[in-house]
Design a protein with these regions (language model features):
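Non-ligating segments of multi-cofactor redox enzymes
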Residues: 1-263, 267-269, 274-514
Length: 514
């Protein structure tokens, strides 16, 4: 019965995670916090606090989870974690027909503690790297830039096929309108880093071919952190004298947490899934409250600890040395309200929550690659040729779980300078063809218009006299929203482009949620 309840809980929390993910769209109602799962990650909370050198109040749910882990053990991994649920489902498909003849090897178990120490050490030196391994961040990221756009593309193709068939057109249109309200994106969006993000996620699932929950057992640093706190639990597995030593519980344990002495459970590995009690024929296993000393040991020797520390320091040095291209840095435009670059990278966990919600408005945010150096990989940047920063939108700051993007009032945001637009006169139609083009000025959202015209009479190469409106940018008014670059009719590279010149970034910010 308990095992069935756990499975229902897993399904519920996965659906809740997906529902909150879909809720992150314009118009966004923050009464349903779409970032609550991200703010529940103790790994993201700890590494971000260490890297930013400040407590981030919005991550308080992560502290609550750690406090619950002390008496209850790693219940989050077995009952709540949405990535764990996805891995369980994937393992059922990948390992169909496979069974374990005995306890599997534990030689890789120390890797997750190695990764955890390396991440914490790097965070102490102000390098935020937990985003690559955090399961909640990983699932949010792959949904945003890979799975959700692919689902939307396939669904739209299905509707086009249905409409082309000529049958039940009215019903197709009704269904499509409903799905576009709740499920489908407002507009089709593609992301530059969708393939690498998808490959990482696929690799995590493919590890199930090696063993059940290989990622959770051996690589997940969040599981390692929860495992450290769960060693003091007062609720857990208990085996009575009815045990016949049949080893079925050990063979069915998805976390390899049951020792060769079947009465001993590694408290740092057990995820309270209750599967061992379900398969125990003499019903010798139960889960109950009661003080119990820590069983099992953290398999991380002094040598491995030193190696993990060195790995974190070397990783920090490698990313800091790998500077970005100077030209690309000049086009590395951050979202409005972003902290100063160093503080921004310290806090940003690369969850792509801002990218997700931006795709329902101006759709300018994309995950970066190395435009700002290796330290900035997968951090959000504005690519104005694919989108623009909506003048009446502040959603990226509202949904950021760590405060890397500050919350701005609309009036403040509309004056916040992301950068400055410049004309490439060798491509601009009025400048090189001597023909009027008003597109950029017409789309400029500022009431006073940051793009103006210098109207002059000129002679064409054919000797004809004509009056041409030559556009120019009022740099003191331009906020760098990028809609001019996005709407520029010139094929290929736009004739007007936004750079970081004059950008306004917050030098210091109060802790997120304060």
């Amino acid at each position: 019965m308990a095992n069935r309840i756990r499975k229902l809980a897993q399904i519920f929390f996965l659906l809740l995670f997906l529902g909150l993910f879909l809720h992150a769209r314009f118009p966004y109602e923050s009464g349903w916090p779409s970032d609550i799962f991200l703010r529940t990650s103790p790994l993201a909370a700890l590494t971000t606090a260490l890297s930013a050198r400040t407590w981030i109040a919005s991550m308080l749910p992560a502290v609550l989870l750690l406090l619950l882990t002390i008496p209850l053990g790693r219940f989050f991994c077995g009952w709540i974690c949405p990535l764990g649920t996805v891995i369980d489902g994937s393992d059922r498909c990948l390992r169909r027909g496979k069974s374990s003849a005995g306890r599997e090897s534990v030689r890789f178990r120390s890797w997750k503690f190695f990764i955890l120490v390396a991440l914490l050490c790097a965070a102490l030196f102000s390098w935020q790297a937990a985003w690559f391994f955090d399961p909640l961040v990983m699932l949010t990221r792959v949904l945003t830039v890979s799975l959700y756009p692919a689902m939307a593309l396939l669904t739209q193709g299905l509707f086009q096929f249905g409409l082309a068939s000529g049958m039940a057109e009215e019903q197709w249109y009704t269904l499509y309108a409903w799905m576009q309200t709740w499920l489908l994106p407002v507009q089709s969006t593609s992301f530059e880093q969708s393939i690498p993000v998808l490959l990482l996620f696929t690799g995590v699932l493919a590890l199930g071919l090696v063993s059940r929950r290989f990622w959770c057992r051996n690589l997940c640093p969040l599981g390692a952190l929860l495992g450290l706190f769960s060693r003091f639990r007062v609720f857990g597995r208990s085996v009575d004298q009815n045990c016949t030593s049949c080893s079925l519980c050990q063979r069915r344990c998805r976390m390899n947490a049951i020792e060769d002495d079947y009465t001993i459970t590694d408290s740092a590995e057990c995820i309270q899934c209750n599967e061992c009690a379900t398969v125990c024929k003499p019903q010798a296993i139960s889960y109950r409250f009661g003080w119990r000393k820590s069983q099992g040991r953290i398999d991380l020797s002094r040598r491995r600890f030193i190696q993990a520390t060195a790995t974190g320091i070397v990783g920090l040095a490698a990313t800091r040395v790998g500077a970005g291209n100077r030209n690309e840095i000049g086009r590395l435009i951050r979202p409005p309200g972003a902290l100063a670059e160093e503080a921004f990278l310290d806090r940003c966990i690369r969850c792509q929550a801002c990218v997700r919600i931006c795709s329902s408005t101006g759709a300018c945010l994309q995950p970066a690659l190395t435009q700002g150096g290796w330290e900035g990989v997968w951090s959000p940047r504005a690519v104005m040729r694919t989108g623009y920063c909506e003048y009446n939108c502040t959603l990226c700051g509202e949904i950021c779980p760590t405060g890397a993007i500050g919350k701005l009032d609309l009036a403040v945001k509309q004056q916040n300078k992301m950068g400055t637009a410049y004309f490439d006169k060798s491509r601009c139609i009025p400048w090189y063809r001597l023909e009027d083009c008003l597109v950029c000025e017409e789309h400029c959202p500022l009431p006073e218009k940051a793009i103006r015209f210098d109207e002059r009479e000129v002679r064409t190469p054919q000797g004809e006299m004509r009056t041409v409106k030559f556009p120019y940018v009022r740099e003191d008014l331009c906020i760098g929203c990028g809609i001019c670059e996005n709407k520029c009719p010139v094929v290929g590279q736009a004739a007007i482009f936004v750079t970081t010149a004059g950008e306004e970034r917050q030098q210091a910010a109060p802790p997120a949620g304060a």
